Amino acid sequence: MLLRDGAPDFAAGRAYYAMFYAAEAALANTELQFRKHSGVHAAFGEHLAKPGLLDAKFHRWLLDAFDKRILGDYSYEMDVNDAAAREMIGQAREFVSAVDTYLKSH
């Protein structure tokens, strides 16, 4: 809806948050606590991507999506175009699906 309404920067931000909250859910049983997004990013890489529990591409996507969210939310110029937002939305769907599958099996 945001993308259709001409707000690719905000659409990209919401795609990031879908990945971020899925990452938090995947890390819920680690008993780790996080104060910053960077803590979730690092723990996702260390505890899920590095040991191969989830594909390492998801860690990269999470980091890239965070950077684009920062640009989209805090930049004065529109830095995230429609194509980039569509790609992030597709990645977010795949990311959330992979985490859902992981959670069902762990």
Annotate the PLM regions:
Residues 1-106:
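Terminal alpha-helical segments
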